[in-house]
């Protein structure tokens, strides 16, 4: 009895050559629909599934392979006498290889203006059923869902007469991953259509983009996975030059891109260890970068710079003056790119347009915290001037700028800003006075005349008192402390204007 291979694929890459090789190795090919037609046109010896089942494809192809003569052939345990007896009684022949990839559901829902009906029609039923059946019976059946594995299977059959059990076991695991991803895409699409924000089940599936040399530290193994649907941000950056991105590179670049997205005007963001160390806006990208660099010329060394305008020659010439890990921008002038390429190891990334809201996920031991991303804009109508003195127009511009930045700094966070640039950033302290002192120390003489943004309220008036002594003229903070009155009193005493936003921006 000839061995049998069932082939039904939506992605036709390499399938004709693979089927011909199976023919040469003595396999009878069974197929359906478009795959059958393709194989027949290319002179592959192939029979229709309906010729095996004795039952035609019906309901516009919705029912093709859901038949005992198919699933019996896949699920039979070959050394079980009762199973073999059942096969003979019902005229079922074993199927040894299954090659399937599924209806293009992902490609369908990514189309513009796709209807729910179109999406539903591209939910594969028979395919996942055969994949699961073949994978479950991996001891006897080889399941293929990825063209990359075709050559391995052919070579093993040539060498051993069959695939090795360890190979079939690996391919079975891969197959269940394939159906898990597929089901996850369907589930999340339907949840979205039902407008359910936090469903009873969270089912995320990601596809591996690359293995990494190591993780956050050299002793940690790591890999990078991409969302198969949402194509934007660091996951979709095009690397134009430089060494392969590391785990920390990707993490830091992501932080830089998230902060950069806050600004519509020309902006430059420098990041180290996911915290901004220099941020600035200006009338052009060259001036924005110079201001960001001058914010902290020490910490930017070895950091990541993200820009939201095309990099010109002047900016490129400044960028190569120091060691940077990565430069990110929407594009690069040809000559500017050639200048940057002189730095052999500099990673140059082109940031693609586009953004979609998604969950913010935080892994904890044994669970997952899921929340909306902190993307609330500053509501000008809810701003409350709580001091006798109101901020000037210039101070308000800097306060808005500092408020955008402080949202992206690890708590407890303080940002000092002046003339559209950060001059001091206090990062990740366990009280509020320490990051204030850190930011003032970093700013030095630039603290005088600057404004201060705090990610959370002041439990005591000490921050205001220290800020006033340093010459800081205006403060923006959420408010809401039991001791707000003391902070307001200290601000009035020091001649500092203060605004309450009613919004907190903790970041952990």
UniProtKB/Swiss-Prot annotation:
GO CC annotation terms, alphabetical: cytosol
Listed EC numbers: 2.1.2.3, 3.5.4.10
Entry keywords, A to Z: Hydrolase, Multifunctional enzyme, Purine biosynthesis, Transferase
Stored InterPro entries: AICAR_Tfase_dup_dom_sf, Cytidine_deaminase-like, MGS-like_dom, MGS-like_dom_sf, PurH-like
Domain MGS-like as annotated: residue spans: 1-145
CDD domains for this protein: IMPCH (cd01421)
Domain of life of the native organism: Bacteria
GO molecular function, one term: phosphoribosylaminoimidazolecarboxamide formyltransferase activity
Stretches assigned to coiled coil: none
Database matches in Gene3D superfamilies: 3.40.140.20, Methylglyoxal synthase-like domain (3.40.50.1380)
One GO BP: 'de novo' IMP biosynthetic process
Matches recorded under SMART domains: AICARFT_IMPCHas (SM00798), MGS (SM00851)
Catalytic activity of the protein: (6R)-10-formyltetrahydrofolate + 5-amino-1-(5-phospho-beta-D-ribosyl)imidazole-4-carboxamide = 5-formamido-1-(5-phospho-D-ribosyl)imidazole-4-carboxamide + (6S)-5,6,7,8-tetrahydrofolate; IMP + H2O = 5-formamido-1-(5-phospho-D-ribosyl)imidazole-4-carboxamide
UniProt pathway annotation: Purine metabolism; IMP biosynthesis via de novo pathway; 5-formamido-1-(5-phospho-D-ribosyl)imidazole-4-carboxamide from 5-amino-1-(5-phospho-D-ribosyl)imidazole-4-carboxamide (10-formyl THF route): step 1/1; Purine metabolism; IMP biosynthesis via de novo pathway; IMP from 5-formamido-1-(5-phospho-D-ribosyl)imidazole-4-carboxamide: step 1/1
Record-stated family: Belongs to the PurH family.
Domain notes from UniProt: The IMP cyclohydrolase activity resides in the N-terminal region.
Matching NCBIfam families: PRK00881.1 (NF002049), purH (TIGR00355)
HAMAP family xref list: PurH (MF_00139)
The protein's name: Bifunctional purine biosynthesis protein PurH
Organism: Thermoanaerobacter pseudethanolicus (strain ATCC 33223 / 39E) (Clostridium thermohydrosulfuricum)
Name of the coding gene: purH
């Amino acid at each position: 009895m000839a061995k049998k291979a069932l082939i039904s694929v939506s992605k036709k890459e390499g399938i004709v050559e693979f089927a011909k090789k199976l023919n040469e190795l003595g396999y009878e090919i069974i197929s359906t629909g478009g795959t059958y037609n393709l194989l027949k046109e290319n002179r592959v010896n192939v029979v229709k599934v309906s010729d095996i089942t004795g039952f035609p494809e019906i309901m516009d192809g919705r029912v093709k392979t859901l038949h005992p003569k198919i699933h019996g052939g896949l699920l039979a345990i070959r050394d079980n006498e009762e199973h073999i007896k059942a096969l003979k009684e019902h005229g079922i022949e074993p199927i040894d290889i299954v090659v399937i990839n599924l209806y293009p559901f992902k490609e369908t829902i990514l189309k513009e203006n796709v209807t729910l009906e179109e999406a539903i029609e591209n939910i594969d039923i028979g395919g996942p059923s055969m994949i699961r059946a073949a994978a479950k019976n991996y001891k006897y059946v080889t399941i293929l869902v990825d063209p990359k594995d075709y050559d391995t299977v052919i070579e093993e059959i040539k060498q051993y007469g069959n695939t090795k059990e360890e190979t079939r076991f690996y391919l079975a695991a891969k197959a269940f991953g394939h159906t898990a991803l597929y089901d996850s895409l369907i589930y999340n699409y339907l949840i979205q259509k039902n407008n359910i924000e936090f469903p009873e089940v969270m089912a995320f599936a990601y596809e591996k983009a690359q293995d990494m040399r190591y993780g956050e530290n050299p002793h940690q193994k790591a890999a990078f996975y991409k969302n198969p649907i949402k194509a934007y941000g660091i996951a979709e950056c095009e690397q134009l030059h430089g060494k392969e991105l590391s785990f920390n590179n990707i993490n830091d670049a992501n932080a830089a891109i998230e902060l950069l997205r806050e600004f519509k005007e020309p902006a430059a963001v420098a990041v180290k260890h996911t915290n901004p160390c220099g941020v600035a806006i200006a009338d052009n990208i060259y001036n924005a970068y110079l201001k960001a660099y001058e914010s902290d010329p020490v910490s930017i060394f070895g950091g990541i710079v993200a820009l939201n305008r095309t990099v010109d020659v002047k900016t490129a010439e400044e960028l190569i003056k120091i060691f940077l890990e990565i430069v990110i921008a929407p594009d690069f002038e040809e000559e500017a790119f050639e200048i940057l390429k002189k730095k052999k190891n500099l990673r140059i990334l082109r940031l693609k347009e586009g953004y979609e809201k998604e969950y913010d996920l935080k892994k904890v031991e044994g669970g997952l915290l899921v929340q909306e991303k902190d993307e609330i804009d500053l509501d000008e109508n809810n701003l409350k001037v709580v001091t006798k003195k109101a901020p000037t127009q210039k101070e308000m511009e800097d306060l808005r700028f500092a408020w955008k930045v402080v949202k992206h700094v690890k708590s407890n966070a303080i940002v000092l800003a002046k003339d559209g640039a950060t001059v001091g950033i206090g990062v990740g302290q366990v009280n509020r006075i320490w990051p204030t002192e850190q930011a003032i120390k970093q700013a030095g003489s630039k603290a005088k005349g600057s404004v201060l943004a705090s990610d959370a309220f002041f439990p005591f008036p000490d921050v205001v008192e220290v800020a006033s002594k340093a010459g800081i003229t205006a403060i923006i903070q959420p408010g809401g402390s039991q001791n707000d009155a003391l902070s307001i009193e200290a601000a009035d005493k020091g001649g500092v204007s203060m605004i309450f936003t009613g919004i907190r921006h903790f970041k952990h």
